[in-house]
Amino acid sequence: MLAQLVQMARQHQISRRAALAGVGGTAAALTLASCSTAEEAMVAATDLSDSEKVLVWHNWAAYMDEDDDGNYPTLLRFQEQSGITVDYRIEIDDNDTWYAKVKDQLELGQDIGADVACPTTWMASRLRNLGYLQALDNNNMPNKVANLAPGYQSSSEDPDRVYSIPWQGGFAGIGYNKKAYKEATGKDAPSSMADLWAAELKGRVGLLSEMRDTVGLVLLSQGIDITSADSLNDDAFDAALAVIKEQIDSGQIYNVRGNSYLDDLATENIIAATAWSGDITVINYEQATDEDPEPFGFVFPDTGATLWADEFIVPIGATHKRNVEELINYYYDPVNAAELALWVNYITPVVGAKEIAAQEDPELAENQLIFPNEETLAKSFAFHSLTGQEEQRYSTAWQNLLLGA
């Protein structure tokens, strides 16, 4: 099961999340990155972890367990146990926009203001190839060595898992407001991408600005095998973009956004959207009432969902690598991994977490969005690994479409 999941994740070569804000800078960053090479090996910053018990963490929204007071229980416990103070910052709304903010410092080998970040697999691979990452030390992460699921233990980009270590994974499908969708369409739930183009939803549909997920879902709906270079070719990609452009131009689409699409669901600016699996759990938690404890739903389109993974990395200029390794080791304890997974509802890469979760919540431990079985994985797909030329062409075309949206 996990071997299949990771193989898909390895092929996921372009951004998971994207926001229209700053998209011009994103395109520029992408162009620069595709032309860059690591001509000289960079030297990692001196590690000050022995004397400075701090670290700064860049992560995505809705990606940490949270209590009613806005605290992060597992992270607070790590700080208490380790004595390391964590400055946890929600800085990544999209891989490319995040990269645009930090690329200048990375190119110079300087501190980007974060000791650890969790970009998507494709971005972690890019940063590694450019020489922008520090190697991690397994001696400081015995839990990672013991509990990293077998399917994750190597990747074509990082065979020995020296530079990147899985954080969480998930699916992209369709999220929707149950009550509003029923009122608008008369149906209980959407079942296909075509349902998003229904006239009853005009102006009330959101799309993720993540190319691999939104375009991927449309490609799947057109019968394209996105795991195959023969099937997912230039003509297929252009045809999918044409469908999306038609829906934008017609006014069917309210907007195209990154993580902030959740705001539009919460305020009912949109009724349905391409969405990330765990996010719908979070918005249900935030918007639940006694009368309606689960106002939002998430479904795989009948033609399949897309799949992605995000990974811990330590930038070349970070000065607290040993502290980060202690953090990673902590989250690879199955008890901590289970607690996190049961809250964020994303796929955990930690062996033993499911068994721990089953003790706490047997029903949730069978949730296919957290612990997917072979049947669920068979319905999810990721882009085949793109060449540099393909990545440049597809990403530029997507960004140009967003600029005109």
For each of these PLM feature ranges, what is it?
Residues 275, 287-343, 405:
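Extracytoplasmic/periplasmic substrate-recognition and gating elements
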Residues 204-210, 214-222, 227-297:
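Ligand-binding pocket segment of bilobal, Venus flytrap-like solute-binding proteins
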Residues 48-125:
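Early extracytoplasmic/lumenal segment of secretory-pathway proteins
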Residues 372-405:
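Conserved C-terminal helix/tail region of periplasmic/extracytoplasmic solute-binding proteins
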Residues 1-14, 25-32:
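N-terminal secretory signal peptides
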Residues 314-379:
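Mature extracytoplasmic/periplasmic domains
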Residues 110-119, 134-176, 204:
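A structural signal for short loop-to-beta-strand junctions that line the ligand-binding cleft
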Residues 36-43:
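Bacterial lipoprotein signal-peptidase II cleavage site
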